[in-house]
Amino acid sequence: VDRDGEARADRDAAPRADQDGAARAAGQDSAAQTGQDDAAAQMIEGLARLSEGTLPSRMGITVTAASAERVVGTMPVAGNIQPYGLLHGGASCVLAESLGSVGAALQAGPGRFAVGIEISATHHRAVAEGVVTGVATQVHGGRTTATYEIAISDDRGRRVCSARLTCLLREQVPPGGHDPGDVAAARE
Protein backbone atom coordinates (compact mmCIF):
# COMPACT_ATOMS: atom_id res chain seq x y z
CA VAL A 1 0.00 0.00 0.00
CA ASP A 2 1.37 3.44 -0.91
CA ARG A 3 1.10 6.55 1.29
CA ASP A 4 -2.29 7.44 -0.22
CA GLY A 5 -3.69 4.10 0.91
CA GLU A 6 -3.96 2.59 -2.58
CA ALA A 7 -2.85 -0.93 -3.28
CA ARG A 8 0.14 -0.78 -5.63
CA ALA A 9 -0.90 -3.87 -7.57
CA ASP A 10 -4.32 -2.36 -8.33
CA ARG A 11 -2.82 0.93 -9.45
CA ASP A 12 -0.06 -0.68 -11.53
CA ALA A 13 -2.52 -3.03 -13.24
CA ALA A 14 -4.28 -0.17 -15.05
CA PRO A 15 -5.17 -1.14 -18.61
CA ARG A 16 -3.10 0.23 -21.48
CA ALA A 17 -6.16 2.13 -22.73
CA ASP A 18 -6.14 4.18 -19.52
CA GLN A 19 -2.48 5.03 -20.11
CA ASP A 20 -3.24 6.07 -23.69
CA GLY A 21 -6.13 8.18 -22.42
CA ALA A 22 -3.82 9.79 -19.88
CA ALA A 23 -1.30 10.56 -22.62
CA ARG A 24 -4.04 12.21 -24.70
CA ALA A 25 -5.18 14.19 -21.65
CA ALA A 26 -1.58 15.26 -21.00
CA GLY A 27 -1.39 16.50 -24.59
CA GLN A 28 -4.60 18.45 -24.03
CA ASP A 29 -3.16 19.84 -20.78
CA SER A 30 -0.05 20.89 -22.71
CA ALA A 31 -2.17 22.64 -25.34
CA ALA A 32 -4.20 24.32 -22.60
CA GLN A 33 -0.97 25.47 -20.92
CA THR A 34 0.27 26.89 -24.23
CA GLY A 35 -3.02 28.77 -24.55
CA GLN A 36 -2.60 30.12 -21.01
CA ASP A 37 0.99 31.14 -21.78
CA ASP A 38 -0.17 32.97 -24.92
CA ALA A 39 -2.93 34.70 -22.96
CA ALA A 40 -0.42 35.77 -20.29
CA ALA A 41 1.95 37.12 -22.97
CA GLN A 42 -0.91 39.08 -24.52
CA MET A 43 -1.87 40.37 -21.08
CA ILE A 44 1.71 41.55 -20.46
CA GLU A 45 1.73 43.32 -23.85
CA GLY A 46 -1.64 44.92 -23.16
CA LEU A 47 -0.60 46.08 -19.70
CA ALA A 48 2.63 47.54 -21.10
CA ARG A 49 0.61 49.58 -23.60
CA LEU A 50 -1.86 50.71 -20.96
CA SER A 51 0.99 51.62 -18.62
CA GLU A 52 2.62 54.08 -21.01
CA GLY A 53 2.95 57.41 -19.22
CA THR A 54 2.09 55.94 -15.80
CA LEU A 55 4.29 55.86 -12.71
CA PRO A 56 5.50 52.26 -13.23
CA SER A 57 6.58 53.01 -16.81
CA ARG A 58 8.35 56.20 -15.73
CA MET A 59 10.25 54.15 -13.16
CA GLY A 60 11.33 51.60 -15.77
CA ILE A 61 9.32 48.71 -14.35
CA THR A 62 9.05 45.81 -16.77
CA VAL A 63 6.88 42.73 -16.23
CA THR A 64 8.70 39.66 -17.53
CA ALA A 65 6.30 36.85 -16.55
CA ALA A 66 2.73 36.90 -15.30
CA SER A 67 -0.03 34.64 -14.08
CA ALA A 68 -2.60 35.09 -11.34
CA GLU A 69 -0.38 32.98 -9.08
CA ARG A 70 3.05 34.55 -9.80
CA VAL A 71 4.31 37.75 -11.41
CA VAL A 72 7.96 38.64 -12.06
CA GLY A 73 9.30 42.06 -12.99
CA THR A 74 12.37 44.25 -12.89
CA MET A 75 13.21 47.87 -12.13
CA PRO A 76 16.47 49.78 -12.58
CA VAL A 77 17.99 51.37 -9.48
CA ALA A 78 19.24 54.36 -11.53
CA GLY A 79 16.59 57.07 -11.53
CA ASN A 80 14.80 55.54 -8.54
CA ILE A 81 17.14 56.66 -5.78
CA GLN A 82 16.85 58.85 -2.70
CA PRO A 83 19.27 61.74 -1.91
CA TYR A 84 21.96 59.39 -0.53
CA GLY A 85 22.19 57.55 -3.85
CA LEU A 86 20.39 54.42 -2.66
CA LEU A 87 17.24 52.78 -4.01
CA HIS A 88 14.29 54.71 -2.60
CA GLY A 89 12.04 52.63 -0.33
CA GLY A 90 9.02 54.12 -2.06
CA ALA A 91 10.33 52.82 -5.38
CA SER A 92 10.41 49.31 -3.92
CA CYS A 93 6.79 49.80 -2.82
CA VAL A 94 5.81 50.93 -6.33
CA LEU A 95 7.48 47.83 -7.80
CA ALA A 96 5.73 45.60 -5.25
CA GLU A 97 2.30 47.14 -5.83
CA SER A 98 2.75 47.08 -9.60
CA LEU A 99 3.60 43.38 -9.69
CA GLY A 100 0.94 42.36 -7.18
CA SER A 101 -1.65 44.42 -9.06
CA VAL A 102 -0.85 42.62 -12.33
CA GLY A 103 -1.46 39.29 -10.60
CA ALA A 104 -4.66 40.61 -9.04
CA ALA A 105 -5.87 41.87 -12.44
CA LEU A 106 -5.31 38.39 -13.84
CA GLN A 107 -7.15 36.93 -10.84
CA ALA A 108 -10.05 39.35 -11.42
CA GLY A 109 -10.37 38.49 -15.11
CA PRO A 110 -11.90 40.39 -18.04
CA GLY A 111 -14.52 43.02 -17.24
CA ARG A 112 -13.17 43.46 -13.71
CA PHE A 113 -10.31 45.42 -12.22
CA ALA A 114 -8.04 45.35 -9.19
CA VAL A 115 -7.19 48.22 -6.89
CA GLY A 116 -4.65 48.09 -4.06
CA ILE A 117 -6.18 48.58 -0.62
CA GLU A 118 -3.24 47.77 1.66
CA ILE A 119 0.51 47.50 1.27
CA SER A 120 3.26 46.96 3.81
CA ALA A 121 6.98 46.66 3.22
CA THR A 122 10.15 45.92 5.14
CA HIS A 123 13.43 47.12 3.64
CA HIS A 124 16.32 44.76 4.41
CA ARG A 125 19.36 46.20 2.66
CA ALA A 126 20.49 49.14 0.58
CA VAL A 127 21.11 48.96 -3.17
CA ALA A 128 23.08 51.64 -5.02
CA GLU A 129 23.20 50.30 -8.58
CA GLY A 130 21.98 47.65 -10.97
CA VAL A 131 18.52 46.20 -11.36
CA VAL A 132 16.19 44.81 -8.74
CA THR A 133 13.84 41.91 -9.46
CA GLY A 134 10.49 41.43 -7.80
CA VAL A 135 8.54 38.20 -7.55
CA ALA A 136 4.91 38.48 -6.45
CA THR A 137 3.43 35.21 -5.22
CA GLN A 138 -0.29 34.84 -4.58
CA VAL A 139 -1.20 34.11 -0.98
CA HIS A 140 -4.96 34.37 -1.50
CA GLY A 141 -6.95 34.57 -4.72
CA GLY A 142 -10.64 35.03 -4.11
CA ARG A 143 -13.61 36.55 -5.88
CA THR A 144 -13.38 39.91 -4.09
CA THR A 145 -9.79 40.15 -2.86
CA ALA A 146 -6.33 38.93 -3.81
CA THR A 147 -3.22 39.06 -1.61
CA TYR A 148 0.39 38.79 -2.73
CA GLU A 149 3.77 38.48 -1.02
CA ILE A 150 6.45 40.26 -3.02
CA ALA A 151 10.16 39.50 -2.63
CA ILE A 152 12.51 42.07 -4.16
CA SER A 153 16.15 41.07 -4.69
CA ASP A 154 19.29 42.73 -6.04
CA ASP A 155 21.50 41.55 -8.92
CA ARG A 156 23.23 39.12 -6.55
CA GLY A 157 19.99 37.52 -5.41
CA ARG A 158 20.05 39.15 -1.97
CA ARG A 159 16.69 40.16 -0.49
CA VAL A 160 16.26 43.92 -0.59
CA CYS A 161 12.62 44.22 0.43
CA SER A 162 9.70 42.03 1.51
CA ALA A 163 6.23 43.41 0.84
CA ARG A 164 2.63 42.30 1.12
CA LEU A 165 -0.22 43.70 -0.99
CA THR A 166 -3.97 43.18 -0.82
CA CYS A 167 -6.14 44.24 -3.75
CA LEU A 168 -9.89 44.63 -3.99
CA LEU A 169 -11.32 43.00 -7.12
CA ARG A 170 -14.16 45.06 -8.57
CA GLU A 171 -16.90 44.12 -11.00
CA GLN A 172 -16.77 47.13 -13.29
CA VAL A 173 -14.13 49.20 -15.00
CA PRO A 174 -13.86 52.68 -13.44
CA PRO A 175 -15.13 55.64 -15.52
CA GLY A 176 -12.43 56.62 -17.99
CA GLY A 177 -10.42 53.55 -17.01
CA HIS A 178 -9.24 50.63 -19.10
CA ASP A 179 -10.02 46.95 -18.68
CA PRO A 180 -6.56 45.30 -18.38
CA GLY A 181 -8.09 42.07 -19.70
CA ASP A 182 -9.21 43.80 -22.92
CA VAL A 183 -6.06 43.35 -24.99
CA ALA A 184 -7.82 44.40 -28.21
CA ALA A 185 -8.68 47.82 -26.76
CA ALA A 186 -5.09 48.22 -25.54
CA ARG A 187 -3.83 47.84 -29.11
CA GLU A 188 -5.99 50.71 -30.40
Protein language model features and the residues they cover:
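Terminal targeting signals and extreme-terminal segments of soluble enzymes
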Residues: 1-188
